[in-house]
């Protein structure tokens, strides 16, 4: 065996040893830290592939967003009801207290900051995508947005997000005053917003995007479905109305209407509210489906069977692996989100709950998440954490165990031949800075900031 063959074999053994070492560290981490650590570098990402038993959660989680005047405004709180575990996600590099979460898709969140800028934020990888400005929309003249008296943010009544975890393609829909604007990124096509022309000047009450179709309730109380499977230009498919046929008389407090699409593609209208004005009054819901004869939502249903409904996502999911059947997972309504009312504030204190449709009763509450915390939370959402095959490698403040492992990995690399790789640049920061992988040299990290 030649010297070069011996060195190559030795290098392969050392590389395998490092991967094994990293895998042992990854197996000790919590679920959240595991998915944070897998994006440290390509070595950690490869090692994470061989860790057994780490999969996407089968039950929805709760995310809580901090209110203003908190010490660590770059953090948020996660709660896994199935495992009864709480996680604090810190150092997001994003001011969560002065921003609003408008929608989510998997682990991606559509954030709207105080400067009226949109961002897509992945909680676990810290990846961030800045969306185009709203000042000009597809040739439209500058739109006059409705602002609160404080002038702190633009009022957006409703938004929807869909992200493909593998390709990073996405759709974003927003209701801006009487417009519904949307932005679609596929490949390198990522430069503008467009107005949904068929419903221009109508506005919307709620909308859901599922399987390339946008389901939308307009302010005129009509349901319209648009098919985006052909690309950016939608095709209007069908229309129905619900109007006064949906029962709201049972609610004495302000009620709200939501749209949901079941596993079979059936559209539901959900109306919720409180029976009286007392703080002790619980949320109640009415669920209606369409009458095929009249094309109106006049059929009151008492059960959705072996499915569960997540109002924040506007979809139903199979009731299995810990997901409760015939239930509505509810967190907050659009009125309180827009007003920024604290989740610990009187009427809003018990918003996070699971409501069983058949029994017409709240079967699970999560008041302890807010009342036991010294930090005020302005909003909460149900979401399904998902982790795609891609990772955007970053430098951030790491878990102490990860830091210790990286030091050990670095010490084991001493004396090995440096590896040279081509420089690649990934733009992912709001301020225009770039995260890039530099050519490596002995004893130096592969990732740096320019």
From Swiss-Prot:
It is found in: Cytoplasm; Nucleus, Nucleolus. Keywords: Brassinosteroid signaling pathway, Cytoplasm, Nucleus, Ubl conjugation pathway. InterPro entries: F-box-like_dom_sf, F-box_BR-signaling, F-box_dom, KIB1-4_b-propeller. Its main location: cytoplasm. GO terms for biological process: brassinosteroid mediated signaling pathway; positive regulation of brassinosteroid mediated signaling pathway; ubiquitin-dependent protein catabolic process. Residues 20-50 form the F-box domain. It holds the Pfam family Beta-prop_KIB1-4. GO terms for cellular component: cytoplasm; nucleolus. Component of SCF(ASK-cullin-F-box) E3 ubiquitin ligase complexes, which may mediate the ubiquitination and subsequent proteasomal degradation of target proteins. Required for brassinosteroid (BR) signal transduction. Mediates ASK7/BIN2/SK21 inactivation both by competing with substrate binding (e.g. BZR1) and by promoting its ubiquitination and subsequent proteasomal degradation. This is F-box protein KIB3. It comes from Arabidopsis thaliana (Mouse-ear cress).
């Amino acid at each position: 065996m030649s010297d070069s063959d011996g060195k190559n074999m030795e290098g392969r053994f050392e590389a395998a040893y490092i991967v094994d070492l990293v895998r042992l560290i990854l197996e000790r981490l919590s679920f959240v830290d595991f998915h944070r650590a897998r994006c440290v570098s390509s070595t950690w990402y490869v090692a994470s592939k061989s860790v057994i038993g780490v999969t996407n959660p089968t039950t929805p989680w709760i995310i809580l967003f901090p209110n203003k005047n908190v010490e660590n405004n770059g953090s948020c709180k996660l709660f896994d009801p199935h495992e009864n575990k709480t996680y604090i996600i810190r150092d997001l590099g994003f001011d969560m207290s002065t921003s609003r979460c408008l929608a989510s898709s998997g682990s991606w969140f559509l954030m709207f900051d105080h400067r009226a800028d949109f961002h897509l934020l992945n909680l676990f990888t810290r990846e961030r995508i800045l969306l185009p400005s709203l000042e000009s929309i597809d040739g439209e003249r500058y739109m006059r947005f409705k602002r609160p008296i404080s002038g702190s943010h633009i009022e957006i009544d409703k938004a929807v997000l869909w992200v493909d975890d593998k390709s990073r393609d996405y759709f974003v829909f927003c209701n801006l005053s009487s417009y519904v604007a949307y932005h679609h990124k596929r490949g390198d096509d990522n430069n503008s917003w467009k107005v949904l022309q068929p419903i221009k000047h109508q506005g919307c009450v709620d909308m859901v995007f599922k399987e390339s179709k946008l389901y939308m309730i307009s302010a005129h109380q009509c349901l319209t479905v648009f098919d985006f499977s052909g690309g950016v230009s939608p095709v209007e498919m069908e229309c129905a109305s619900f109007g006064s046929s949906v029962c709201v008389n049972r609610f004495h407090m302000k009620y709200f209407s939501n749209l949901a699409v079941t596993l079979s593609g059936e559209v539901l209208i959900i109306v919720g509210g409180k029976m009286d004005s007392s703080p002790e009054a619980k949320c109640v819901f009415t669920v209606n489906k369409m009458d095929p004869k009249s094309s109106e939502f006049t059929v009151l249903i008492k059960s959705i069977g072996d499915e569960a409904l997540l109002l924040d996502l506007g979809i139903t999911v199979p009731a299995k692996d810990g997901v409760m059947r015939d239930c509505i997972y509810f967190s907050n309504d659009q009125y309180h989100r827009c007003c920024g009312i604290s989740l610990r504030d009187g009427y809003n204190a018990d918003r996070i709950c699971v409501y069983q449709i058949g029994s017409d009763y709240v079967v699970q509450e999560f008041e302890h998440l807010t009342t036991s915390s010294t930090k005020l939370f302005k909003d909460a959402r149900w979401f399904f954490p998902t982790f795609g095959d891609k990772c955007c490698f970053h430098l951030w403040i790491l878990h102490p165990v990860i830091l210790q492992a990286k030091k050990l990995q670095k010490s084991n690399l001493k004396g090995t031949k440096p590896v040279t790789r081509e420089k690649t640049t990934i733009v992912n920061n709001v301020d225009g800075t770039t995260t890039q992988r530099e050519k490596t040299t002995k004893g130096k990290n592969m990732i740096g900031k320019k």
